[in-house]
């Protein structure tokens, strides 16, 4: 049985704290991932977002784009504005033949605010989650209909983080969670060979 495995560049550098591991180049990251047996890599801050430039670099290491973070603002924003915000990444991921965009809601998040304790993260009522769930479901449907589905990434310091928040999110939305979507992509790429 063969499976394709992908990894995120956060194993080599941190997009939120640029000063961490700034000495690791994109090519070194891809080389090490390839040697370790990974065939997919999420995008990160060192990735050119143009397949004409990125494609040959990925091909050199036998790596493909398997996803990548999008900092969503739909909780407090307008769906049409969010479509405009994601359009460039949407087009790039289609060109890269990526399985999905990783959508993380960053509106109201305390992530990156070093003086803010994690306990001060925003919390939504069930009624607010229901409104957000309908909004993100409509947005996810639009993304999928236009050729690039999203997977939802719950995240520390964000409005959807805890198990209880995930339960409410799943109750009020149709958006697949990141681990479920990636597992589905992984299982669909498994092939059996006789040996």
Where do the PLM segments sit?
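Hydrophobic faces of well-ordered beta-strands that scaffold small-molecule active sites
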Residues: 3-9, 41-43, 65-70, 101-103, ...
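Acidic-and-aromatic substrate-binding clefts and catalytic sites of carbohydrate-active enzymes
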Residues: 40-53, 72-84, 156-162, 183-192
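Non-cleavable N-terminal signal-anchor transmembrane helices
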Residues: 1-42
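Acidic (Asp/Glu)-rich catalytic clusters
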Residues: 1-2, 30-35, 48-67, 84-99, ...
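Active-site acidic/histidine proton-transfer and metal-coordination neighborhood
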Residues: 79-178
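Short, glycine/charged-enriched secondary-structure capping and boundary segments
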Residues: 20-22, 55-58, 115-118, 164-167, ...
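N-terminal small/glycine-rich loop or linker at the start of catalytic domains
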Residues: 1-18, 66-72, 109-119
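Active-site mouth loops of central-metabolism enzymes
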Residues: 11-25, 44, 72-83, 121-129
